[in-house]
């Protein structure tokens, strides 16, 4: 019998063990450019460890997932953080796990609104990008440079995500 994962709304508090939620937070807002622009300052910090490492900006186009979806693997980046911010304004799923002795624990699933992004801290277990409904573009900030910045883990028995409510 498969083990089903519940989908919860993405909130700063619930996501705090894994990184930051990137959204327009009034507490971080300041006016700039003569009062014509609201700047939501320092919502997350990019990490790029190792000699020759640098922070880069990418555009990812995620293809929609089919449901029910089997979460059979997780990945993490030991040398850098990775952030995903939707450019298409569509919701997406965020799947993360706490580390349990060098392997991912039971995954947690969050539904991000189309105006929310996430920043996975360095070394946080997460599932690759999970677009919903249709192909969606994401601005991705992560690390480039020497060294293997990808570790993958495959579960013996996948966890299952039911289709998110519309």
From Swiss-Prot:
- Superkingdom: Bacteria
Q: What is this protein called?
A: Ureidoglycolate lyase
Q: Supply the EC number(s).
A: 4.3.2.3
Q: List the Gene Ontology MF annotations in alphabetical order.
A: ureidoglycolate hydrolase activity; ureidoglycolate lyase activity
Query: Gene name?
Result: allA
Question: Which cofactors must be present for this protein to function?
Answer: Ni(2+)
Q: Which CDD domains match?
A: cupin_UAH
Homology family: Belongs to the ureidoglycolate lyase family.
